[in-house]
């Protein structure tokens, strides 16, 4: 069952977060740009309001939240009503797939990754951006998830855990990147993007279809 209720009811709150935390957003976007290809037939799974898709040049994707789809359409994007576990795309049809802060909301992460593997062309790229549950911000989200409109039903993952799932579902790992260091309310400038993981709270994994 898609976890869409919070996003349908609190669409403005979701979009406003990126305005309030503009340096965090820009840092995350810079990390994604290091991993995501600049051209090719790409989609975003969990495109939301298009906050990441638009600057990354992605024009379409799937999104189960009706209100989020409306926001994406207003930006000229083409969101399709769908979920990660059952993608409405042909086999071997996409050069790249993006998922940003979406993995914590899927019902079945293994099936989701298998579906992404199916729609990717040979050697296609799968780029994931997420908050590591073992990071400072991840631990804060976990500790306060019952109070959060968006995260109360979320399932968080650690980087090592995701790397193992990617390997099991037919992907090899090309690179990992990290950014967002420290507490959210203490970030007052765009932060560096470093290779690897273990220090930053926002992690980007660049994987490739085997």
Predicted features and spans:
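Short alpha-helix
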Residues: 153-176
């Amino acid at each position: 069952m898609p976890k869409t209720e919070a996003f349908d009811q609190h669409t403005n709150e979701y979009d406003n977060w990126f305005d309030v935390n503009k340096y965090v957003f820009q840092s995350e976007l810079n990390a994604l740009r290091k991993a995501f290809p600049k051209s090719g037939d790409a989609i975003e799974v969990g495109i939301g309001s298009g906050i990441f898709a638009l600057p990354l040049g992605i024009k379409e994707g799937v999104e189960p939240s009706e209100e989020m789809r409306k926001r994406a359409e207003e930006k000229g994007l083409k969101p399709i009503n769908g979920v990660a576990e059952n993608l409405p795309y042909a086999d071997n049809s996409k050069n790249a797939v993006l998922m940003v802060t979406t993995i914590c909301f899927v019902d079945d992460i293994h099936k989701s990754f298998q579906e992404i593997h199916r729609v990717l062309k040979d050697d296609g790229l799968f780029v994931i951006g997420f908050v590591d549950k073992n990071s400072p911000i991840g631990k804060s989200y976990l500790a306060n998830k019952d109070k959060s409109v968006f995260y109360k039903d979320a399932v968080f993952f650690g980087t090592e855990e995701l790397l193992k799932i990617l390997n099991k579902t037919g992907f090899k790992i090309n690179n990992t990147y990290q950014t967002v260091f420290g507490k959210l309310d203490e970030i007052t400038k765009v932060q560096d993007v470093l290779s690897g993981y273990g220090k930053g709270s926002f992690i980007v994994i660049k994987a490739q279809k085997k």
